[in-house]
Structure formats: C-alpha cells, structure tokens
Regions:
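Cytosolic nucleotide-utilizing catalytic cores of signal-transduction proteins
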Residues: 1-184
Length: 184
C-alpha cells in the first residue's frame, strides 16, 4: 500500500530509486560501526517468478563477500561474479580446500621436494595458455625444463595438460588453494 513518502514496486521492477540508493545506504551502514565487518549480497529478479533465483544469487554473492573480505565490509552483486576466480569465492572454504587438495594433493603427498617449482610452473604454464616458449621465458628456464616439469605435474596429478578439461580442473584447484594471510 502506498502512502506519503512511500515507494511502490510492480512485479519485475524495484521500487523507484531503491537500486541507486543501495551504495549510499551501504556506505552509511559500514561507516556507522567501522570495527564490525558487514557483508551483503544482491541478486536481480526480472519478474516475480525470478525471486527464488535472485535469492539464491544474493546468498551466493553474500558468501563471496564473506570470503573475499572477511575482515572488512563488502557488498557484492551476483552480476559481478563474471570470472572463474570470482565465481569460486561463493563456494564454502572447506569445499574449495578439499577440491584443491584432491586435485593438487598428489604433488604434495609424493614427498616431492620440488613441489613449489612444479606449482609455479603449472601456474605460469596455464597463465601462458599452455605456451611452452612463453612459460620458459617467464620462468627464465629452457623449454626442455618446462616440458620436464609439466610432465611431472601430469604424473603426480594424473591430469593431461593438453586436455582443456584437465587444464580447467587444475586452474580451478590453484584458485581454490587456501590463501595465507598477508604479513604486516
């Protein structure tokens, strides 16, 4: 019911001015008690039928906000989760860690003292779109050394880096690794 100073909404449209006001309201809420980290997530519904989906998106965005800014206030719109890295932030930390350990774990469990070099090679190789020469250049190594390291990664993980699906699994596992807190 609309009254003086009240805004009304029709199905599929937010009340006039609600969306543009949200950043300003969020800034006020965050500033009211800066020592308390506030987290919020938003999702968009284009119709009444889309409300359940919008709620699910908002919950996922909220989980992402909590993950990416555990000690600071953050408001994330589900529409901003447009890449694999940002999409993965909405997955619970325990699930991300378990996935990473499952996929990359053999590198660590093998007792391989060169696991750090293998992980670095894997990260650079994937960042260079599987280019042997660009990876070698970025790591200041000979191409044969890159080939050897990639073969070792494939051996320990059971993944084939010439397969797109295996590359995606390994990239996701790297992104899911637990992050160490920054040193002061």
């Amino acid at each position: 019911m609309a009254g003086p100073g009240r805004r009304t909404a029709t199905a599929g449209r937010p009340a006039a001015g609600v969306a543009p006001d949200l950043p300003a309201v969020w800034a006020l809420l965050s500033a009211a008690e800066p020592s308390v980290a506030l987290h919020g997530g938003t999702g968009r519904a284009d119709s009444a039928e889309g409300l359940n989906g919008a709620l699910a998106q908002a919950r996922y965005a909220l989980a992402s906000a909590r993950t990416t800014s555990p000690d600071a206030s953050a408001l994330i719109d589900a529409a901003s989760l447009t890449g694999l890295g940002t999409l993965l932030t909405g997955i619970p930390a325990e699930v991300r860690t378990a996935f990473s350990r499952t996929v990359l774990g053999p590198l660590f469990e093998a007792g391989n003292p060169s696991f750090a070099a293998l992980l670095e090679t894997l990260e650079i190789f994937l960042a260079c779109d599987g280019s042997w020469s660009r990876t070698a250049e970025a790591l200041h190594l000979h191409v044969n050394t890159v080939h050897y390291r990639v073969q070792r990664v494939e051996h320990f993980t059971g993944r084939d880096l010439s397969s797109l699906y295996d590359r995606l699994d390994l990239r996701a596992a790297l992104l899911c690794r637990p992050r160490r807190p920054a040193r002061p």
